A protein has these predicted regions:
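AAA+ P-loop NTPase catalytic core and its hallmark functional loops
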Residues: 1-182, 186
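Alpha-helical lid/collar subdomain of P-loop NTPases
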Residues: 171-277
Length: 277
């Protein structure tokens, strides 16, 4: 996924993880502190000033533009405390286009004035989001933030930071490895092509049985987006040392069962216990 959410308690390392990971793979990193007043995409990409007749650009837009000139270098954009404002307001355009094929990942920046010659990577006032760009959002769970909606969760891979972990020492070499976008894509493709990592018909049947149970008990279902995410994530998860069952558990718990949050009826507890058994 090109959109990842790190969510949980404050002070558990959500902001540190992308910082150190970017350093480890030698990726370009931009931290964007989200503000509570953000309401639309202009807070991220800037706007055209009618008085000065100039575009007031942001560091976010500049970095996105530069990413188009460095297609083999991974660029990470960290939206720090992303839910201090409503994500679906200022990030709506990005949420939509990331659902399309990669060649259609385009954001309209501005309507160009007549006879205006745009920069090379800003054709017709539109900027391409290249596939070497990854968005990472850090999100706290407290009274100062907004609840992240299902629309956002469904389009992202969410990693929970619910517990404080003890310090540990890294065994082995932790020096920078200079991972390029093409090398990363090759690793993805190798994992997806490995038949032993892929979901089998039997795996899908087991998953369907659980899905039917969740629908019957909680009236919760999901669309093809999650099925596509399963086919993409499971092989990569297994290639990293996990199992198919763990990968499905990861997705089900965050994409489907999380929708039960806030329901306290006794039948919910009983149905969940039966599901676990």
């Amino acid at each position: 996924s090109h959109f990842i959410i790190l969510e949980g308690l404050s002070g558990t390392g959500k902001s540190s993880l992308p910082r150190y990971f970017a350093k480890f793979i030698n990726a370009n990193l931009l931290f964007v502190p989200v503000q509570a007043t953000w309401r639309d995409k202009t807070n991220l990409i800037g706007y055209f000033n009618d008085f000065s007749k100039a575009y007031s650009e942001t560091e976010f837009l500049t970095s996105l533009y530069h990413a188009n000139y460095n297609p083999d270098m991974i660029h990470m954009f960290v939206l720090d405390e992303m839910n201090i404002s409503r994500v679906e307001y200022y990030f709506a355009d990005f949420l939509s286009v990331l659902e399309y094929p990669e060649e259609e990942w385009k954001i309209k920046i501005m309507q160009l004035p007549y006879n205006f010659i745009p920069p090379a990577k800003l054709d017709d006032g539109v900027i391409q989001i290249p596939n070497n760009v990854y968005f990472v959002g850090t999100a706290n769970k407290d009274d100062s933030t907004f609840t992240i909606t299902d629309k956002v969760y469904d389009r992202a891979i969410t990693i929970d930071f619910d517990n404080r972990n003890d310090a540990f020492n890294v065994n082995g070499d932790a020096s920078t490895i200079n991972l390029s976008r093409s090398a990363l894509a090759k690793l993805y493709q190798e994992a997806k092509n490995n038949k032993s990592y892929q979901m089998t018909d039997n795996d899908y049947q087991k998953f369907q049985t659980i899905s039917d149970y969740i629908y019957d008990q909680f009236d919760i279902t999901f669309g093809n987006r999650i099925l596509n995410q399963i086919s993409e994530l499971v092989p990569v998860f297994v290639s990293c040392g996990g199992t198919k069952e763990e990968a499905l558990d990861f997705l089900l718990s965050r994409k489907v069962i999380s929708k039960i949050e806030g329901r306290f009826e006794e039948y919910v507890k009983n149905a969940l216990s039966e599901l676990l058994n």
